[in-house]
């Protein structure tokens, strides 16, 4: 039985008093594609977030932050004890260097905690202009071996996010070779190209994935056409929706976190700056709960069944451990291709807390329905909707998306409901199977 090595705990944002069993865990690093997603990541327990500004980021369509919004985001996160890393991870052309010095100085001024960089030229400028700022090497830099990691460490990099195509054994060897921090992707979408360096989008649509504008053609539905039979399309697999020959399952290393901790991972990263705020909140919540579970136990303790149940409510393209145990096989490709719709969908976001919360509806729901509030940890509160009122006090039978509403709720066991913004409510979209007996 291997306990966690003792150290000072990370900032906990007041969720509970420090426990004598607290141990240092890897940083839980969450995506923040916009202000609402940032708030979700903070609320549900991220230790740090990564986000992009209006320039230099590989997620041009993620919403991102203006300079003023970046300033506010850093202030909000720091007020909660959460670190902020700013992505500047495009593959830069000469024209991209105009204004880079000023932008780096701005990021230093607002006290960003680190810079995520892939391009050696941008890295060199950052080392010259803001030498005191930590530099995190992006996975797009394709660090696949210990000698490469040592090279980047010698260049002044303080953290490396290795290529996603490495096994646990390879990561452990890298850990032995370098002292720089290692940040490992543990959950989210996978790209079929080598650690995201893809030209398929540029070739098919003119949108350059390496400059933040990926059109995600790996998610398109493809059919095969033989040149002498124009108009006759043959599915590569017998599926009337076409074939998803490029479409990998999603990464999920939830049950492998103890091995990554033992191997020396310093940060565990969740992919998804372009995912929904519901995705960000539920995935961060799940991984936070898992880390806290092991914080108070030994790493050999198995996760209780409710973790698998919670994971099943998130949805996605199926789950894969990717290269964790070696090269993935055909079973790690998703033959049906499209992301599955989970049986649970977002219902509302809490805007004002309390027993009768003010919420922003995200999907329709109605009076008399049972929805579920997602507390911190994995505490879920099923609630029956007794009444719905709009901001003018009028009672409604049904909630429509994007409306602000006051809910009167009762929990199944009459337990007090401690709703806090920006907590999430979800609703079941598919009724569970009934027992025929």
Show where each model-derived region lies:
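Surface-exposed amphipathic alpha-helical tracts and adjacent flexible/coil segments at the periphery
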Residues: 2-42, 48-50, 55, 74, ...
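Alpha-helix C-terminal capping segments
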Residues: 42-45, 127-129
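Gly/Gly-Pro- and Ser/Thr-rich, intrinsically disordered tail segments characteristic of DNA damage-repair
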Residues: 98, 132-133, 137-144
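Glycine-rich, positively charged N-terminal anion/phosphate-binding segment
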Residues: 59-76
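N-terminal glycine-rich flavin-associated loop
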Residues: 117
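Alpha-helix capping/helix-boundary segments
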Residues: 121-122
């Amino acid at each position: 039985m291997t306990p966690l090595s003792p150290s000072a705990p990370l900032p906990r944002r007041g969720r509970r008093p420090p426990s004598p069993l607290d141990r240092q865990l890897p940083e839980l690093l969450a995506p923040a594609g916009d202000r609402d997603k940032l708030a979700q990541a903070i609320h549900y327990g991220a230790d740090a977030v990564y986000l992009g500004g209006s320039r230099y980021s590989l997620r041009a369509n993620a919403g991102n932050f203006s300079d003023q919004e970046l300033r506010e985001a850093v202030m909000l996160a720091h007020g909660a004890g959460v670190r902020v890393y700013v992505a500047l991870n495009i593959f830069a052309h000469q024209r991209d260097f105009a204004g880079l010095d000023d932008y780096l100085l701005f990021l230093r001024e607002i006290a960003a905690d680190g810079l995520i960089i892939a391009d050696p030229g941008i890295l060199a400028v950052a080392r010259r202009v803001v030498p005191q700022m930590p530099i995190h090497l992006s996975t797009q830099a394709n660090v696949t071996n210990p000698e490469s990691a040592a090279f980047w460490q010698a260049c002044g990099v303080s953290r490396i996010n290795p290529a996603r195509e490495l096994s646990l054994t390879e990561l452990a060897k890298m850990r032995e070779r370098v002292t720089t921090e290692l940040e490992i992707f543990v959950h989210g979408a996978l790209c079929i190209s080598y650690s995201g360096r893809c030209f398929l989008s540029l070739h098919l649509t003119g949108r350059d994935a390496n400059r933040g504008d990926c059109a995600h053609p790996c998610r398109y539905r493809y059919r095969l056409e033989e040149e002498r039979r124009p108009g006759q399309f043959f599915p590569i697999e017998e599926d009337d929706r076409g074939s998803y020959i490029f479409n990998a399952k999603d990464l999920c290393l939830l049950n492998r976190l103890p091995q990554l901790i033992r191997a020396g991972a310093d940060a565990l990263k969740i992919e998804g700056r372009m995912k929904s705020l519901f995705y960000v909140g539920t995935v961060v919540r799940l991984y936070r709960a898992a880390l806290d579970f092991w914080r108070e136990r030994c790493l050999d303790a198995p996760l209780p069944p409710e973790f698998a149940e919670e994971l099943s409510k998130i949805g996605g393209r199926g789950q894969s451990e990717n290269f964790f145990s070696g090269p993935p096989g055909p079973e790690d490709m998703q033959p049906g291709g499209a992301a599955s719709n989970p049986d649970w969908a977002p219902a509302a976001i809490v805007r004002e807390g309390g027993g009768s919360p003010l919420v922003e509806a995200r999907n329709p729901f109605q009076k008399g329905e049972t929805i579920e509030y997602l507390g911190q940890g994995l505490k879920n509160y099923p609630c029956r909707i007794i009444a719905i009122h709009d901001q003018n006090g009028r009672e409604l039978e049904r909630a429509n998306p994007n409306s602000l509403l006051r809910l009167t709720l009762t929990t199944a066991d009459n337990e007090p409901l401690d709703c806090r913004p920006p907590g999430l409510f979800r609703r079941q979209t598919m009724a569970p199977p009934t027992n025929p007996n």
